[in-house]
Amino acid sequence: GLAPYLLLSSSQAQSTANSFEKISDIALSQISALKNPNGHLGVFRIPKQGKLNFKDWVVVLDGLQDPGNLGTIIRLCDWFGIKQILCSPDTVDVYNPKAVQASMGSLSRISVYYESIIPHIQGLNIPIYGTFMEGTPIQKIAFKTPGIIILGNEGNGISAALSEFVTEKIAISSHPASQAESLNVANAAAVVFYE
């Protein structure tokens, strides 16, 4: 995760950062990349990444493009105790302001790696679950730890190259009367992580 270096706030706040400064709302809005900053802005040192390991759950993100989805998935991982995310190199940047904002601080507690996925997962002897429209209904899956959960691109799903490594295709059943085409990838992640 990340370690706080400086916290700027338009209100009094407790901080574990080395430095804390109270600033005006106007000053905060001038330095923030967001139209409506929430009153706090943090500056973090990016620590050297530890080595990715597969001793517990790892979430793999295959080509996600929406920074809000990435930030939400980081927050979900934090909520459900998943500490590592492996992103394909074409996944949106984790430090995109919208991704950072959507993570709501969870980015400081989750390790996010950007590397080629296949070299990491080929030859692993653990379950690799992938989200598909035509998979086994999630409520029928007996998830085993450690394991990998692959979530695909918003428009195209999991790439054909990664699909070959999936040992269990999983799906989230819709209500019979539903006319929705699919779930947003972050919404799907919430359902899968809960199971």
Question: What are the functions of these language-model segments?
Answer:
Residues 76-80, 91-108, 160-195:
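Structured adenosyl-cofactor binding patch, chiefly the S-adenosyl-L-methionine
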Residues 17-26, 56, 126-128, 144-148, ...:
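Active-site regions of enzymes building and remodeling cell-envelope glycoconjugates
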